[in-house]
Amino acid sequence: MHSRNRRQFLAGLPAIGLIAAHATEDQPLEHIIFGSCLDTHEHPMLDRTLTLPRDLFVFMGDNIYADKGGIPMMQEKYALLKSSRFFQGLKNKPILATWDDHDFGQNDGGADCPIKKEAQVEFWNWLDEPADSPRRKQEGVYHAQSFGPAGKRVQVILLDTRCFRSPMKKVTKDKAMLGGTSVPTDDESTTILGAEQWNWLKNVLKEPANLRIVVSSIQFAPEAHGGECWANFPHEKRRMLSLLQGHTAIVLSGDRHWCEFSRDGVFDFTSSSMTQKHPRGTPTTNKHRIVPKTYHLPNVGHLHIDWAASAIAVNVIGEDGEAKIEQRVSFTKLQIR
């Protein structure tokens, strides 16, 4: 097997290490809890999360904040998270994770991050990935895991939006938007995922699944807000939508420290932050927002799969355990056309 094809194959192997715990092909997934932006390990929202119905938990990035202290701080923060009551309470069910900039090692970082290789080692150490795991040998933390039997199979695809990402196009501060100075580029030689990860994704999408959940640390649907999002690389966004054509899929994203539900070719449900409230309390402009309400206090997302009705319900859950944003979507509407 060609070395590139072999790496693509290995990245799609069934999970091993901690993230394999309790995974089964026989039991269909019904309840997925997901969250991002975890800056403390003791918080009422984390306690509430452990009480929610859960077949799988997904960390969507910024799982620690260690972009200013190098590898020693990263090791310390991962150790604190790993020993926390919250993380220990999650381990009775499968856990999946990807990273964003603050656990990658550089704020808004991309391919030029000087400690990305060392950060990847610490990421897999946190998840107890075995020393001989194929995932430790590839560049980037992208991977996929399938759950459930034929007819009720869910494929969770965790993207790495950091390791290969080209520098973002920036404007001066006097031209900044509410969310920052990042703007779309027209340079189609730039990338978010990189050639290797794109090739891997193409192959992973050939695997059988009734529902595909694509986890992106940054938002996919929203655009023109000045912060990090797929719309800053419009050719990459178009490429993703093209690859997803014909699939029943939803994107889960984090990063923004608020929650919203958007659609631009594919549904994008953003849940952020698990432990922080947004200081401004108002979102940036998003013409693709399909639910007017947004939520800016600590939260997690809950995706419930109703197999009998061929539909999903996605909710933002607050500290009180109540749903703050709710939306039900049929599998038919989730099909990318």
Question: Where are the language model's segments positioned?
Answer:
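Metal-dependent phosphoester/phosphodiester hydrolase catalytic core
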Residues: 6, 16, 22-337
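N-terminal secretory signal peptides
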Residues: 1-4, 11-18
